[in-house]
């Protein structure tokens, strides 16, 4: 018995601050047959270009990533300025929500290995990375 199903995965727009990971992502999206556009954009520039890219590609899913970590002098996990790029990711999420106001319009994944999870979720990401969850995996 053969059952044929049409599966719609949605169009992906992926912004990544690291060229190596951008290139890897393109490779994996192609292998999986996903409809994805990957742009290598430094974290600090992502918020300023996200609306233009959303208008151009009209994705269902937005992935915002790059590198992030606590700064060496940072001791307060609840201060966004103690993270290298979390504020840039949060700003990009806020800008993107001007275009896709709800998760039905645009699903947003944001952050990197050690991002400020709570700030990304408050910015209205649907999914985010967490430093405490990710650090535990490598200790």
Q: Can you annotate each of these PLM segments?
A:
Residues 44-58:
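Acidic, metal-coordinating helix/loop segments flanking the phosphotransfer/catalytic sites
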Residues 54-68, 125:
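Proline-aspartate-enriched helix->loop->beta-strand connector
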């Amino acid at each position: 018995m053969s059952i044929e199903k049409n599966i719609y995965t949605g169009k992906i727009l992926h912004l990544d601050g690291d060229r190596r990971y951008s290139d890897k992502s393109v490779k994996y999206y192609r292998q999986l047959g996903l409809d994805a556009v990957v742009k290598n954009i430094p974290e600090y520039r992502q918020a300023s270009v996200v609306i233009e890219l959303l208008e151009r590609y009209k994705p269902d899913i937005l992935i915002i990533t790059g590198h992030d970590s606590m700064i060496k002098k940072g001791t307060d996990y609840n201060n966004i300025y103690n993270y290298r790029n979390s504020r840039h990711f949060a700003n990009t999420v806020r800008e993107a929500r001007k275009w896709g106001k709800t998760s039905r319009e645009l699903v947003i994944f944001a952050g990197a290995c050690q991002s400020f999870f709570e700030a990304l979720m408050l910015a209205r990401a649907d999914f985010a990375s967490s430093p405490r969850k990710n650090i535990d995996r490598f200790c």
